[in-house]
Amino acid sequence: VLIILIYNLPQFFTSTSDLLSSPFVSGLIAMVLCESAFIAEIYRGGLMSVHKGQLEAAKSLNINYAGIQKRIIIPQAMRIALPALANEFIVIVKLTSLVSVISLGEILLVGQRLYTQNFKVIETLLAVSCYYIFIVTVFDRLVTALEKWLDTGSRKARGLSDHELALLQAQPPAPALQPARKYASDKHRVTLALEGICKRYGNKPVLKNINLAIKKGEVIAIIGPSGSGKTSLIRTMNGLESLDAGKILLDDQPFLHPTDNGRPTQHYYQQAEKIGMVFQGFYLFPHMTALENVMFAPLYHHTGAKDDILAQGLTLLKKVGLLEHAHKYPHQLSGGQQQRVAIARALAMTPSIMLFDEPTSALDPELVGDVLKVIENLANEGMTMVIVTHEMSFAFKISDRIVFMEEGEILAVGAPNDILHSTDERLVKFLHNQKSALTTLAL
């Protein structure tokens, strides 16, 4: 119907006769109008299938919108949409036969004209069918080859190359960990300061006048019942959630504050690389290997020569115990291994503070220990960290201070021993519910 309508449009609008009198142009416009909606829907489905966490992980690495689309979203969406696009191409090939109603020189129409002249109906239609099969088969083989090339699931992980081993061996040995970490004192400068932070989701307040100063080298664990605002608080610290009131200072410089459009100001983009973020759901980029995930942000921001960034990536993977898995894709790794790669990826930008949002909640119990060991090693190295966790024993073991939250408010802040022996009724009730985890503490 659309084809006939466009071909006959010059009868109603004579000004279009020069353009639309051509069967090819009329057929082309009709096919484009008909198929563009289907193809656009296929692309939309591919884009919608990319997990939102991929976007947040890229934002936490200070990747701008264009970079996120080009390097993260579109490559994944294309992999998802490719099979449906191949099917749509076959549909388009079949629909070209409909265009013959307006006398376009389409293969089937040419065949019909031939057998009216030579009277070899079977032979002519057989030749026409061979052409159709050839067109579809060749394209199908090309698409299959492209799918195979894009499919990370069928790739086998390779070992480290001689060049990579040489770069790794040229790196200076890692400094020995402190046998017992030195806790931050009042003399340490404040790295991150939260002043009067408020946040609402609709009419529901989730953060109420939060004030917190995090010193350099300090480890702070945020605990509290589910729904107390812990994750919302840590997400405001690196700009994943906008502020409704208050401000955040990073190294005594403006970092985040409320804006009319809800978007961070230039202060944020100038300093965002100083904050590393590790998510509960890992959010590794599935089309990149473990090493490529770690190298992605430094390469994007041009922090050094490619060989230097490669050496740094290998060193970080060695640090988290995954050097032998450098060329594996995320789906080839266990949950604990993926989370350790995520930690290495966050460390690749050499942040001054690390944020951990329930880093072990999505892991099987037997995988938790390896991730916690990496975090503990970072604490012993003096890394400033804020950890939202339900691992009570771990939180009380490595933290300088414990922050207890409930209903969007900070109810208690103090040293682990002080929190453990607090008389606050709500805190006592919460700790009592965590009694089994806390019995292993030796404070």
Identify the role of each PLM range.
Residues 1-164:
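Transmembrane alpha-helices and adjacent helix-loop boundaries
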Residues 255-276, 419-423:
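ABC ATPase NBD coupling module
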Residues 238:
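Helix-to-loop junction immediately C-terminal to a conserved catalytic motif
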Residues 395-397:
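A short, surface-exposed alpha-helical micro-motif characterized by mixed small hydrophobic
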Residues 354-357:
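Catalytic Walker B motif of ABC-type/P-loop ATPase nucleotide-binding domains
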Residues 328-331, 349, 381:
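Conserved signature/switch motifs of ABC ATPase nucleotide-binding domains
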